[in-house]
């Protein structure tokens, strides 16, 4: 029994693997390209503070989040780093952003004027990166003449410092031709702005898959996200790089019972036992990360043996067919990670639904405690906050 547990279902994060992943990414991009670590949604629900501490110790200076609230949490812990909010920030939050030296994404001349006025009132310079829509059709200035004129006007605002300009790939692996076109649209537009006197310290468009498969698109800065944590949302990984998943998800057996042939298991009597079955119950369910669509599809590891989940996954519990496997209440079960010679990968789980690794990870519920290990020793828990 692990004496640090506060719940019999939990996540373990390997900080050594995370550190190795960050070193590998730095090796991929080289010394001339700045690495902006994407830690939005609390580092994809894996813990922005403990993971960013590792990155800061490795010399990484730039971080990206989705919202100002995420940026302010980071700023409280890391007063010296540079933090970019990738998404929209409402005008009423401009003052907090300026006072805390948060870099904002801008794609509106009107917003820029309001931001400039607020910075002037505070006797500060507002820091911004300009977003360009090169084909994602999400946010950003379009690449038209009017946009160039508006961006030039933003450059002329005295209390705004335009540090960077960026765009985002829509289909980096699945549509390389469209990706190339996006890159060309973006860089051509930036070159045209430069001819108008608008120069940028950082140009960035490369995301995780671009970093892996298209180093020619790195420019001055890259924004790796999911690959930092050892996952790719891809069927392929370049052999020269060693990225490892940092997550293990485990639970303890809560119940063991013998169910007779012909009897049923779970809600709606969804599973009918075709033989006498040893049914193990685990204390986690769809409120923790495993949606019902995965019912009767996933496997878990019990004492090194693969065992099938049976019945409908419940909100807080799921049942497992452990027939023929020696086990006891309290035994550790692996739902993601390694046990003995077997391994359950997040990608395996995602193959049973339309989900991707990025999406699956961000469904890890806050009630699952997270424990962080370095050199196989527990060094931090989100319960210490």
Predicted regions and their residues:
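Active-site anion/phosphate-binding pocket segments in diverse small-molecule metabolic enzymes
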Residues: 2-15, 19, 69-70, 89, ...
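Active-site-proximal beta-alpha core segment in soluble small-molecule metabolic enzymes
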Residues: 2-5, 10-12, 17-20, 31-204
